[in-house]
A protein has these predicted regions:
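Cap/lid segment of the alpha/beta-hydrolase catalytic domain
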Residues: 128-208, 247-257, 262
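Mobile cap/lid helix-loop segments that gate and shape the active-site cleft of serine hydrolases
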Residues: 215, 239-278, 283, 290-303, ...
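Glycine-rich active-site/cofactor-binding loop and its immediate structural neighborhood
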Residues: 94-149
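Bacterial Sec-dependent N-terminal signal peptides
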Residues: 1-28
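Alpha/beta-hydrolase-fold serine-hydrolase catalytic core, especially in secreted/extracellular enzymes
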Residues: 23-116, 288-398
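Conserved hydrolase catalytic core segment
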Residues: 233-239
Length: 398
């Protein structure tokens, strides 16, 4: 009799286990159907979606209500409805390397207990008082010798911004750089959540370092453009947004860090990256686009919709687009030549430190460092004992 009872109890617990497992799988399957990835819309569908959305907001108040809803859905879809408790940053800051008009220090800090964000801090050598702050995330460049924030084009913009008078933090995406070598990967399912949280903590870091809270900008290209407009949408401490070659009515991002969680859609809600980018309105925003990727329609499709939203605030001139029809995807020279004057204007930077009076770019004095030279962990600054070495070890506070 006892054996039969034990068998029945065991069967009951097995049924409960498989029932819970089935429920969790059902939730996962439902979330998957809500994903908007890559070319989720055709170009014509993207334009039609924006045209239809105008009926939802014909006044400033109606747009503000819509923007609030978009922010809520981003945070809900990313699993950040409730922020985890912010741990001390415990920043590890390396020695200064001084160059012509700027200096560089490698940095690591904790975004969550044991989770280290790695990057480099660029500053003008003649810094006085509170400096404007620029966060600059990178895109998905991952070929050996041409990786993320270590690429020459990235180092050039970091250094140029610093020469112009800004505090600049260029930081690694999850699984890139030294953390990738330690065991982290960029392909984990919830990398969007951690990456967005890391960007929030990067803002905390530059503010803790003394950046002017009224002059904070974010700019990056491709996947770095996605990080730019997502952060600007959900964190109002970002005062200026410059997403490069990314904002599109029809393309939602092809990486799990951009669209691998249901931030764009649920059963009763749909948005796209144009509306997400617009959440910063009426603060200044510059789109930089080219003729060879999903931003090719910016002058005819995305910009007019953004102008429509900014006009609701009577500030249509605060959103701009520089379109380069003969350029390709990247943050190359022509893109930087478009961004430098915009950030100089709105952050009060010295444009002469990066551009000549004839409009040509001045970057010949900038030193391109080797990738390993930009790593924060070395013999003098070893990887901390509490440091997490893989995505699956991350603990989110419930």
């Amino acid at each position: 009799m006892m054996k039969i009872y034990q068998l029945l109890v065991a069967c009951f617990f097995l049924l409960c286990f498989f029932s819970l497992e089935a429920q969790e799988q059902k939730k996962l399957d439902a979330a998957q159907t809500m994903l908007c990835q890559g070319n989720y819309f055709t170009e014509s569908e993207g334009k039609a979606f924006l045209d239809g959305q105008k009926n939802l907001y014909t006044t400033q108040k109606e747009w503000e209500k819509r923007a609030k809803l978009i922010r809520q859905h981003i945070l809900k879809g990313a699993g950040l409805e409730k922020f985890p408790k912010k741990c001390p940053l415990n920043a590890i800051i390396g020695e200064k390397r001084v160059y012509d008009g700027y200096q560089v220090q490698n940095v690591a800090f904790e975004s969550l207990p044991g989770v280290y964000v790695t990057g480099s801090l660029y500053m003008p050598t003649s810094a006085k008082g509170r400096l404007p702050g620029i966060l600059s995330p990178h895109g998905h460049w991952s070929k050996k010798g041409d990786v993320g924030r270590y690429r020459p084009d990235a180092q050039k913009r970091f250094a140029a911004f610093a020469r112009m008078g800004a505090m600049v933090f260029g930081y690694d995406m999850v699984g890139y750089g030294q953390m990738g070598e330690l065991g982290w990967t960029h392909s984990a399912p919830e990398v969007l959540k951690l990456q967005l949280w890391n960007s929030i903590r990067c803002l905390d870091f530059i503010l803790e370092m003394g950046a002017d809270p009224e002059k904070i900008a974010c700019t990056g290209a491709s996947g770095g453009g996605t990080q730019t407009f997502l952060l600007a949408a959900i964190d109002q401490r970002v005062k200026i947004s410059v997403p490069v070659v990314m904002v599109s009515a029809h393309f939602f991002g092809g990486c799990v860090c951009e669209s691998g969680m249901p931030i764009h859609k649920d059963l009763n809600f749909q948005t796209n990256n144009v509306e997400i980018a617009a959440c910063i309105a009426p603060r200044p925003m510059l789109l930089v686009s080219d003729g060879d990727d999903w931003t090719k329609n910016n002058p005819e499709v995305e910009l007019p919709h953004l102008k429509y939203i900014y006009q609701l605030f009577n500030k249509p001139d605060l959103v701009q687009n520089v379109h380069l029809p003969n350029d390709k995807h990247g943050y190359d020279l022509n893109k930087r030549a478009a961004v430098y004057p915009f950030l100089a204007k709105y952050l009060g930077l010295d444009l002469s430190k990066a551009m000549n009076t004839d409009g040509t770019v001045r970057e010949d004095m900038i030193v391109i460092e080797e990738q390993q030279a930009l790593y924060p962990f070395d013999n003098q600054h070893p990887f901390p004992a509490n440091g997490i070495r893989s995505n699956d070890q991350v603990k989110w506070e419930k």
